[in-house]
Amino acid sequence: MGERQTIADSKRAFHQAFPHVIAPLYRRLADELLVELHLLSHQSSFKTTPLFAVGLCTVFDTFSAGYRPEEHITGLLDALCSSNGYDANTFRKESKRCIDAAKTESVDAMDSHLAGQKLGEGSHYSRLMAIGVLRLFEEAKGDADQPDEADLRKRCKELSTALNFPAERVEKDLSLFASNSERMSAAIELVQETIAAERRKKERRQAEQAQRSES
């Protein structure tokens, strides 16, 4: 994207690429990622990395869970990326490649597995990179079916120096991601329960109307 691209330009391009109403529950996701990608696109020392791709796709998938209509989800990420000069399909492919590779590694082997992902000197760090590291730790083979998230976040922080990530920011970014994910999951569950309750009420009313019609 050119240096003159403003956030207003990015928003305009986004709405042209995705001319659909976004439910309030998901509007924050769209707004925050749009602004985040816009700012990164203008950061001269920022370069996309495989870990960034994993983190971006993880954040998007986490906070778009339950989105309806489901067929709009791919287009939403496409528009968020394209409006800022990025390609969502490239990120998706890179993310899948990294996750597939992580699944063949043990959790203890991930430090050496990720050694080649060190951020270059002077390169701009993004929270999405740290989230990408966490996701790969989650995908690695472990002894437990459900890995301890706090332990994995600790491992990510310990690895941050080797990856040339700011350790304190990594800890803060991962903690915030965890708390926001929990809140989003609870909100989605509440919405789904409300929809299910409304559906049951509607079905009861229809059944009662049918009984009255027959009597």
From Swiss-Prot:
<dbReference type="GO" id="GO:0030096">
    <property type="term" value="C:plasma membrane-derived thylakoid photosystem II"/>
</dbReference>
<comment type="similarity">
    <text>Belongs to the THF1 family.</text>
</comment>
<dbReference type="GO" id="GO:0010207">
    <property type="term" value="P:photosystem II assembly"/>
</dbReference>
<comment type="function">
    <text>May be involved in photosynthetic membrane biogenesis.</text>
</comment>
<feature type="coiled-coil region">
    <location>
        <begin position="188"/>
        <end position="209"/>
    </location>
</feature>
<dbReference type="Pfam" id="PF11264">
    <property type="entry name" value="ThylakoidFormat"/>
</dbReference>
<protein>
    <recommendedName>
        <fullName>Protein Thf1</fullName>
    </recommendedName>
</protein>
<keyword id="KW-0175">Coiled coil</keyword>
<dbReference type="InterPro" id="IPR017499">
    <property type="entry name" value="Thf1"/>
</dbReference>
